[in-house]
């Protein structure tokens, strides 16, 4: 199954993404339910991974949380998630990318770990509550990033308060991307007598 996350995660587009994820979740539940009643393994329906393509410069954190949590619901069913990043994978897009069990990207992809921004627009009591939520969300993203890469908290602290842009090579180095396995060429050595047998 496939899901495309393209553009900024804003209300209108993100509702469509969330609705698609709910439909995908229902379809997986249906397949898993059918497979649980199968007597012979040959009759089982193949459970394909969920391929998520991401081309996003970020978005609103509460939309990120909704989509990320729904991806985790699907993953908790035993479904493999494979994320693919192209072009730009920034902020909320990067967090969603980290949901992948396997993570791949185009070589020209630019990644960005975001120094989240807090807008102070309400009265003082609301500001305290909103800021506490902001800190909680920021801590969650930091935890997700650290758990799914080779990056330490100390390394992230070096970039605190500013956006951290990096490319494919550094993404591979820090464990953000799944290394692509290349099959080794096999060398076949045959004796002269085996060669003569083959030629006959």
Predicted regions and their residues:
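N-terminal organellar transit peptides
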Residues: 1-92, 98-200
